[in-house]
Design a protein with these regions (language model features):
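Tryptophan (W) side chains
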Residues: 3-6, 32
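Residue-level detector of alpha-helix boundary/anchor positions
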Residues: 1-2, 11, 138
Length: 322
């Protein structure tokens, strides 16, 4: 196999100094990978996603490496760093280096407690396992619908950071699709039609379909308005912003709203465009909620343990101001 090698340099609003890429392109299949500030970045999917090696996220990263991670988020939307060994303190420290942590809405809404880490899976704080019939197991099946994290908040999530500690032998994958690629597949006419639209996102609307929402939780998350089409400030790439929390289009009736939002969601979640991530212990995955949709897949909670620690980073502000 032959390789063509060249260098690129990027300097943008997030980065005060150039980031040098050494890009290696294989011939003739066009597959390529990049060496960025000592990190080996290998694409996972034609539309998005990369596997990143050569970096220990539990160790302090210098400014150049952090800037390279931020740039890779903009370029790939999904980054998997395998074989990472972070405890809660180091994960939160890494999160703070990337941006402002987001308060876990479930713990705050249900109990009024401010926490920045949450557990994805069926393991309690004391190490016990919740089974399939547990109230919270049923409640969290809402994550099996296509969604973008915290799109129901006035300032939605920028990125989610999830570190796998225990994973089931079967099931429990997380599937991802790119709403950026889906927007690009739309003809020019429909793109122009949806560009100015505003959509109501509503947590109670989506979660009530799987389980009752505690009143204090509902009160903490009133419906919010979000732009239907978002633009990445660093790259200019555009995508539409939909998912299970998207209830209706502002100014449209329910039937027309539902028809449009369902059609856009279907266009983004075609089977051939899905990347299914099979979790391995030690995986640390960062995904960009501005442009990716994701959903969890079922696993047997009576048989398997699943424990992944998650932090989220707040967006820069309301999507209405983008």
């Amino acid at each position: 196999m032959s390789w063509t090698v060249w260098q690129r340099s990027y300097k943008g609003p997030y980065f005060p100094f150039p980031i040098n890429y050494v890009v290696l392109t294989s011939q003739p299949d066009g597959r390529w990978r990049a060496m960025v500030s000592g990190m080996d970045i290998e694409p996972l999917h034609p539309d998005f996603g990369a596997r990143v090696t050569g970096v220990d996220l539990g160790a302090p990263l210098d400014g150049r490496s952090l800037s390279a991670v931020r740039r890779a988020i903009d370029d790939y939307s999904f980054l998997c760093f395998p074989d990472q060994a972070l405890d809660d303190d180091s994960q939160l420290a890494f999160t703070r280096r990337i941006g402002e942590p987001e308060v876990d809405h479930v713990r705050f809404g249900r109990d009024g407690v401010v926490e920045y880490l949450s557990t994805i899976g069926n393991i309690e704080d004391d190490g016990s396992r919740r089974g399939n019939d547990h109230e919270l197991t049923k409640y969290f099946t809402g994550n099996n619908m296509w969604h973008s994290d915290s799109s129901f908040r006035d300032v939605p999530t920028f990125v989610t950071i999830t570190h796998a500690h225990e994973v089931p032998d079967q099931g429990g994958e997380t599937e991802f699709v790119s709403a950026r690629a889906a927007y690009g597949r739309l003809p020019e006419g429909p793109r122009h039609e949806i560009d100015p639209l505003i959509v109501i996102h509503d947590y109670v609307y989506s979660r009530s379909r799987v389980a009752p929402v505690k009143q204090s939780h509902a009160d903490s998350l009133p419906p919010v308005e979000q732009k239907l089409v978002r633009t990445n400030p660093a790259t200019g790439a555009r995508n539409y912003y939909v998912g299970s929390h998207a209830r209706c289009v502002v100014g449209w009736n329910e039937a027309d709203s539902r028809a449009l939002l369902d059609d856009l969601l279907a266009g983004a979640t075609r089977r051939e465009d899905i990347y299914s991530h099979r979790w391995r212990r030690g995986d640390l995955v960062i995904w960009d909620n501005r442009c990716l949709l994701h959903r969890g897949r079922l696993y047997d909670a009576d048989r398997y343990r699943r424990r992944m620690r998650q932090t989220r980073i707040r967006g820069a502000g309301s999507t209405l101001q983008e």
